[in-house]
Structures are given as C-alpha cells and as structure tokens.
C-alpha cells in the first residue's frame, strides 16, 4: 500500500519534528524572559467582520525551571464556522519546519505549503474534506501565531483574518 507508507512516513516525520522542537525549546538563553500574556492579549482581541468573539480573550504565562512559555487566544464564530487565533512566545523556539526550504505538498486529503504573511514565514494547511485549515506564522523568529478554522471552505477566511492583526507591531515585542 504505497499511500499507507507515505502517510506513515509523514506521521513519523511530524513526530520527529515535534520531539526535536520540544527538546530544542527546553534550552532557554540565560536571562531571557517570555512576554507576559497580558501584552499578547490585544493582538487576539480583534474585530473580524461577520464574526462574533466567544467570551473574552484569555492567556497564560508559565515559568518553571528552564521552561518558559506565554500564550494568548481568542475564539470566534460565524454560523457553523469557528476560528481560533493563538499567539505563543517560546523565546525564539518557533516552528521548526519554517527554518528550512520551501514546502509544497498536495494530496487528495490536504494541501500544505510555505508562504509569507505580512513579510513573515508561514505554513498554510487545508483539509478540504474536513473543511479545516490552519495558518501558522513565525513572527520575528520569536512568536508563533496560529489561526485554526473549522467549517471553512478555503484558506481565504484565515488570510483575511490575519490582515486584521498587526504582526509588525507584535514583532516589536521580540526583545
């Protein structure tokens, strides 16, 4: 089953990348501090035409030994469509697959490709059968901005939403 082997190989690669990212993220520069989640909240508290924010934006800052991370998130709804906007600070331990070469993969289930959003490296993924898409952006080699949409027909929804965000201003928080 060639398709099964290809899927298994992709899963193994994803696991390997994930594990290397976790190990890499545990090494924190001496004296470095994550941005407190309260500074990230305004970037997810956005007005999206046609969408309603569910509740209030929320966030967390965790510091335990050498592990430090901050995140802020906002959830939105428009009919049967849902959207989550997440910003994470891992002290520069951003998305590992964005540091390499250009990527483009298309199968009957999904499309994955590297791109640029507001001048920052990004990866977009769309699962057409599930009507689910993701846009992952590395901002200033410090922040991971993730837009996750469910019930969407294409990635244009996410691309339009990210235009409501001031990623260049977020980049100024990278000390």
Where are these regions (language model features)?
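Bacterial N-terminal signal peptides that target proteins for export
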Residues: 1-18
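N-terminal non-cleavable signal-anchor helices
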Residues: 7-9, 28-31
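Short glycine-centered, acidic/aromatic-flanked micro-motifs in structured strand/loop junctions
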Residues: 11, 25, 149
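Generic anion/oxyanion-binding catalytic loop in active/binding sites
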Residues: 21, 40, 147
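C-terminal segment of classical bacterial N-terminal signal peptides
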Residues: 21-29
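Charge-dense, low-complexity intrinsically disordered segments
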Residues: 26, 38, 152
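Short, solvent-exposed recognition patches
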Residues: 34-128, 132
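A short, solvent-exposed beta-edge/loop patch
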Residues: 77, 82, 105-175
């Amino acid at each position: 089953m060639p398709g099964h082997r290809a899927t298994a190989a992709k899963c193994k690669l994803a696991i390997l990348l994930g594990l290397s990212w976790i190990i890499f993220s545990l090494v924190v520069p001496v004296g470095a501090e994550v941005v407190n989640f309260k500074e990230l909240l305004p970037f997810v508290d956005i007005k999206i035409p046609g969408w309603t924010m569910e509740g209030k934006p929320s966030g967390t800052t965790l510091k335990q030994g050498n592990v430090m991370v901050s995140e802020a998130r906002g959830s939105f709804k428009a009919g049967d469509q849902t959207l989550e906007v997440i910003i994470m600070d891992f002290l520069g331990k951003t998305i590992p697959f964005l540091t390499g070469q250009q990527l483009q993969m298309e199968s009957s289930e999904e499309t994955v490709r590297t791109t640029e959003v507001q001048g920052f490296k990004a990866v977009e993924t769309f699962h057409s059968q599930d009507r689910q898409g993701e846009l992952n952006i590395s901002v200033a080699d410090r922040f991971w901005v993730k837009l996750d949409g469910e019930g969407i027909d294409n990635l244009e929804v996410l691309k339009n939403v990210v235009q409501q965000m001031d990623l260049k201003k977020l980049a100024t928080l990278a000390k």
